């Protein structure tokens, strides 16, 4: 029986599946076909949520005993955009100039392809691992993340699955393979502010109440002063205004309502609850100060709505896990990786509730872009790093 030891061949099989969230597109079927020859027991649970599309997921395990290492990731990808803008079709896995092109090449079908190849090589050399390896793979990472990893973890844990450590194969490297490992993630909190005024003619402002004035003052309060100066492990907390809207196409009408949305990426100075309280306090103070509203004495009238699912900040302090991966990277590439908490959120935010988790994959420079691509040499290098990591972890 031929084992899936070639990462490029594995990746081509996955890229050719049009698995744009939430469509499975054949990607999990292709992955299952790779894992079965390795002796994996495979389940494909489908999860549902009212108002969301059903999503198929995959959980596979090789081995029965501990220690138990989880590899986590996703086969779903973002849409390719204008396919005519691609040099090579986004779902063809064409190779040119020593690089494979395709949506998901680095985010993150490439990471999955390499870990499968690494495990296959490890089993060829060492036989059944002294413990267990599992794959926790979702089709809902690039979407709302409602019917994906969060439910797959609950499902597996309810069946008695327990993990000692997890590795997520997201594209963590900035410029060169081996330059960065993610050992934590900032938290993420989103909200929407709505201000209510009174519509009127711009030539008669005393007869109206322009909510845009109050909105400017409230947004200033969110932007200044800085929330903090950063910590030993995280950069400073950062708030960005993401939308501002008054729903008013006319230039001579004062709007009746104004809204703004924001997102905060926060460090370990804050919890979700303490940050929400700080934002509420800032808005309440700014509303009471009543700046930028001449002739108005009543406070600004506003509503604050928390959006989406907040993600708490986390930091993995498992010295063995981090040291084993860092040593494996250095042994293969000669580089000492930076241990970082930068970047956006990932499904590691769910996994950290079950076991220590770190992230390491390919270079992310072309992820989500037209002509997403990966050098074939990087696929081989990452496979060798993963294989060395498996050898060291189970030694």
From Swiss-Prot:
EC numbers on record: 3.5.1.18
Binding residue positions for Zn(2+) 1: 74, 107, 170
GO biological process terms on file: diaminopimelate biosynthetic process; L-arginine biosynthetic process; lysine biosynthetic process via diaminopimelate
Positions contributing to Zn(2+) 2 binding: 107, 142, 368
Matching Gene3D superfamilies: 3.30.70.360, Zn peptidases
Cofactor note: Binds 2 Zn(2+) or Co(2+) ions per subunit.
Keyword Hydrolase assigned: yes
Coiled coil region boundaries: none
NCBIfam families: dapE_proteo, PRK13009.1
Function: Catalyzes the hydrolysis of N-succinyl-L,L-diaminopimelic acid (SDAP), forming succinate and LL-2,6-diaminopimelate (DAP), an intermediate involved in the bacterial biosynthesis of lysine and meso-diaminopimelic acid, an essential component of bacterial cell walls.
Protein name: Succinyl-diaminopimelate desuccinylase
